[in-house]
């Protein structure tokens, strides 16, 4: 698929994709994903063509931007590494997030409280989000999925080839997708304007690590705010015991008495 020159992959975005290991696929390859393989390393890891990854990101963003109501786009992630990215994507684009376990019947059982009728579904992994894809096929909802080389593509309309198991890779793909959607909607005025949101915001963070960092910061603030106690003068009234005979010094009182005579 050829893109207009304005949609070409920039050197900065290519560096981000490589730094996040988006190009490192699985060792197994499904026949439908073979066109996305650039080459196979000696250790068996299939290297994904990031040029085709970018083309699919642009295609997916154009599909999302074509939906008038942003809330009609449902974004799902049962995988832990993708839940933060899904929530951030929904916050920036107005989509409806489904982070965590997908409740069966969300798209098919209208009696449930969580029933939704989206016009487009985006999933992080076709394996972990298989229930969402299955129900989408029942009600004719198109599906966009982040697919690794061993991911099934049944009922997936747009597959974005990438490493969908690493936390940095997942976060970066969702960030690039959100940025491209905002560009197409005109919220980001042109392609020369940098998006103020950093990719790190979409990366998964361990809750224990967050608590540990917060505890360390609070300790540092307490140490800075603690007042430093000044050295108090010694008013105990005790004097040093001096042996005047050994030192050869004459007490001041004796000197005064001798001078009077």
Swiss-Prot record:
Organism expressing this protein natively: Meyerozyma guilliermondii (strain ATCC 6260 / CBS 566 / DSM 6381 / JCM 1539 / NBRC 10279 / NRRL Y-324) (Yeast)
InterPro entries recorded: Ribosomal_uS2 (IPR001865), Ribosomal_uS2_CS (IPR018130), Ribosomal_uS2_euk (IPR027498), Ribosomal_uS2_euk/arc (IPR005707), Ribosomal_uS2_flav_dom_sf (IPR023591)
Which gene underlies this protein? RPS0
Question: Can you say where in the cell this protein is located?
Answer: Cytoplasm
Extent of Acidic residues compositional bias: 222-244
Alphabetized, the UniProt keywords read: Acetylation, Cytoplasm, Ribonucleoprotein, Ribosomal protein
* Known role: Required for the assembly and/or stability of the 40S ribosomal subunit. Required for the processing of the 20S rRNA-precursor to mature 18S rRNA in a late step of the maturation of 40S ribosomal subunits.
According to UniProt, the name of this protein is: Small ribosomal subunit protein uS2
What are the BP-aspect GO terms? ribosomal small subunit assembly; translation
- UniProt biased composition (Low complexity): 245-261
Where is it chiefly localized? Answer: cytoplasm
Query: Positions of the region Disordered?
Result: 211-261
For molecular function, the Gene Ontology terms on record are: structural constituent of ribosome
Which Pfam families does the record associate with it?
Answer: Ribosomal_S2
């Amino acid at each position: 698929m050829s893109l207009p020159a304005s949609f070409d992959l920039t050197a900065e975005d290519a560096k981000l994709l490589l730094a996040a290991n988006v190009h490192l696929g699985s060792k197994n390859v499904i026949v439908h994903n073979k066109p996305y393989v650039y080459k196979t390393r000696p250790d068996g890891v299939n290297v994904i063509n990031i040029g085709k990854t970018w083309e699919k990101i642009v295609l997916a963003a154009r599909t999302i931007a074509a939906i008038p109501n942003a809330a009609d786009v449902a974004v799902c992630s049962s995988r832990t590494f993708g839940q933060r990215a899904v929530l951030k994507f929904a916050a920036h684009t107005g989509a409806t997030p489904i982070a965590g376990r997908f409740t069966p019947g969300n798209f098919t059982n209208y009696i449930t409280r969580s029933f939704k009728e989206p016009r487009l579904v985006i999933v992080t992994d076709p394996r972990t989000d298989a229930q969402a894809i299955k129900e989408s096929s029942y009600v004719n909802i198109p599906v966009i999925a982040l697919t690794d080389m061993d991911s099934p593509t049944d009922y997936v309309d747009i597959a974005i080839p990438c490493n969908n198991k690493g936390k940095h890779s997942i976060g970066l793909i969702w960030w690039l997708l959100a940025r491209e959607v905002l560009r197409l909607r005109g919220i980001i005025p042109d392609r020369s304007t940098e998006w103020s949101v950093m990719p790190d915001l979409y990366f998964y963070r361990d809750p224990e690590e967050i608590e540990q960092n917060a505890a360390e910061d609070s300790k540092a603030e307490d140490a800075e705010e603690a007042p430093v106690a000044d050295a108090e003068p010694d008013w105990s009234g005790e004097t040093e015991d001096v042996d005047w005979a050994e030192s050869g010094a004459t007490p001041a009182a004796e000197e005064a008495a001798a001078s009077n005579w």
